[in-house]
Amino acid sequence: MKPPIYYPIAIRLAMPIYRYMVHKKSQHLPTYMREVKERFGQTYLPAPTAVHIPVDNLEKKVNKSGCHGRVIWCHAVSLGELNTAYPMLKILLNQGFNLWITSTTQTGFNRASVLFEPLLGTRVNHSFVPVDNLKTIQVFIEHIQPVMALFIETELWANTLYELRQRQIPAVMVNARLTEKSYQSYAKFPKLSTSMMQNLTAIIAQDEASADRFVRLGADKVKVSVMDSLKWSSVHQLSADNQRLIQQVQMWQGVSHRPIWLVGSTHDAEELLAIQAHKKLIEHDPATLLILVPRHPERFDEVASLCQSSTFITHRRSKGERIDPDTQVYLADSMGELLAWYAVCDVAVVGGSFVDVGGHNPIEPAALAKPVVMGKFIKNCEELVDGLSKVSALTITDSASQCLADAVASWLFDEDAAHQAGMAGRQLVVAKENAATKQAEQLLIHLSITDSTTNQSD
């Protein structure tokens, strides 16, 4: 179904503005020229064509006949979406497919470089997502020649979906979610939304409410299915570096026999809330330690200044400082180490949920058997929060320092209760960890149907 006539006109008019925005945001970055060329369809790296042995051994195999070397395009907006999709993408690699990853953000682009580093240039390549101009999209698709396109969670582009449909390339929305707020925004443009819904081959929603909203936007009900969120499978094994870090931290004199709580993936205002709550927890036990892990590296110095102004004795990971017996707040201002810090703490508070961000992934601490506390802004992870709450592994509290302190204290100073909650969460994660396998199998079914249809038409 063709997008309404106003959409391609609006995209063309917006392209100079978008180019300026890219310039303003990325001109100081080493990837700037590459980003400009890729977003506007000028130059791309070669498409992956190599055929390699599986990435790792998987217990469950499906027939890989005819899939070696074929490219699946996966669009993941940023770091979070790519982390979520990673277990499923590994399964597709193990089936013999190659991957082309696109990202909207710099953090997503950088994460792809890390996750797929050994395979880049052979079985995997990545780029910034091209602007949704029809000619640009045609250049991109012609270059990578995908047999399927995957869109992780939320971001869709009408011209892209139309071009994929014209080329009979299946387009699947994976781990799809649609909040009521997003639904209302899409519903303001009914013809545009209907065109996108109609041009999708399938929508794998992560909850019934999202599935219903997609249907109301114009998706055929038969195209929409509901499966457990990929986030249940998204906890990667601790890297060797993280395992070494855990061992090192556990040997530091300032760690043993102390109640430790952590606030991870924090955003502006959440660190102040944590520090205010920490003042109340220290009144209960002066040995209590707070570990802060900000979400964005550009805020590390800002958070450090906040901690130092609080009068708490603060040490920083980026300065090579350890947790000493007198450390009251430890700023883990590093990237790629969040899981290690979760492993060290007794109670985990997941950020992005005390301000209107939508909440980050509670599965990460739950998988490590840590009781979890979150705020009420959880639109990005409602299904996960509901599941963990039902087994009493997670509690929701208000964005007030006393409420946060009380919620943390109920586990931090009750070892048995914390252990019981942590194990309940861990058991739930284990029970649902095959979510990636199930969604990958669904994708392979759609591919086999497409192959069969293509062969018949030939």
Located regions from the model:
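Nucleotide-activated sugar donor-binding and catalytic core shared by glycosyltransferases
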Residues: 1-458
